[in-house]
Amino acid sequence: MSHRILMRVSPRTGFSDRLKQRIERNLIRACASDEGMASVAANAVPRAAPWLFRKFVLVLKAPRCDGDRVVERGVLLLKNTERLDFFRRCMSMASVLKDYTLVLEPSWSGYANPKLLAFDSYRDRPVVVMSPCRADYEFLERLNSRLRPISIGASDWVDPRVFRPLASPDKRFDAVVIARWNWVKRHHLLLRALRRIADPSYRVALVSLNVKGDQDRSAILSLIDRYDLARQVTVFEDLVPARVNEILNQAKVNVLLSRQEGSNRSLFEGFFAGVPGLAFANHIGIPLDHFTTQTGRLIAQDELPDALLYFREHWAKFDPRPWAMANIAPEVTTARLNLFLRQLARESAEPWTQDIVAKCNRPGLYYYPDAPDEPDRPDNKPDGHGFATVDDLVSRYATISARSSKANSSRTRRSSRSGAVPD
């Protein structure tokens, strides 16, 4: 926790760097010690309910067997920090890792987190960790553990068939903000910027998702009224992805106001929709190198009003979709991950005769391209592959204690719904 706070509050000061180095040295020693990792990995066992993992667990490659013996491991993707932690505690991980290489897609930056570090306790198998934030990538590299970082994340799995430019959209909004009703999204910065701009013709779309556990909706709406901005801010809630794409197409710039979060997806959905992005240059979590002269701008916080006015007039100078299709489309990201996994297999002298299939985030895990007549089935089988479903995985790998754990089941259901970041 100390390391995560230091990274967020003061990532570049010498004093914080010295503290971080001391904390990291202790973490490195813990990761090198079986006893240290056992203490991190020890948690109460929740009930292994399949609903807990649907759209958060996906097989990208099936194991290849010779009779009852696995001769080539498959690839299993776990998404969302809370859900992958539940998975680890519910399943017989020795059996899972005997059959699959794990790929983790955490939902929040700051990887000095027991829920991630616990996966280093399985000494005989490497675990791949998507690390879009440079600080997290470098942190895992310095640990020199079995957690192997790759510089991809949620931003790199957007479905370009859903998020795409529409024919001649009317630019109704000067800006769009896609954000949960949560203080971490810092809506107040936008509202203060609008008050500073003091132009009643400036229009903003606020697209929000109501997530159980988020408690700041009424406070944010009250702040809109307090600043007398109700006529300038149009609120949309709980839209399906295709409708979010329509709102994106009606906006001139897509704004991220947070200081830290996970890889973020909405900014890059905007890229695929042809809408430039605007974020803060000191943001922790998003891949900052995705911002180019084609895709958008990174700014200082006090530059927000001027930047909003700039995009109001110059949005047409940006064209982010070609860059996104060439660099972060699902096929491109799948190829990068596949190469990384193949090299990892060779390092371990393991066979690699079958590549992984592609997936996308919409926002849960889906195969890509999926069945055109059933695009919303999370367990559809691309190209006829008979991959294991979530129910199959729970049936095969759930521990006896997880199958029988009923005392914790209601508590697990409540915490997973309120605490998980739906990204």
Walk through the language-model features, giving the residues of each.
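Short alpha-helical donor nucleotide-sugar binding micro-motif in glycosyltransferases
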Residues: E246-A251
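N-terminal pre-catalytic "stem/leader" segment of glycosyltransferase-like enzymes
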Residues: M1-Y100, A335, R411, R417-D423
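Nucleotide-activated donor-binding/catalytic signature segment of Leloir-type glycosyltransferases, i.e.
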Residues: R217-L239
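Conserved donor-binding/catalytic core segment of Leloir-type glycosyltransferases
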Residues: F163-K185, L191-R196, V204-A205
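Aromatic "clamp/platform" in nucleotide-sugar-dependent glycosyltransferases that forms part
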Residues: R259
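Short hydrophobic beta-strand element within catalytic cores of glycosyltransferases
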Residues: G270, P276-N282
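A charged, aromatic-enriched C-terminal amphipathic alpha-helix characteristic of glycosyltransferases
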Residues: R312-D370
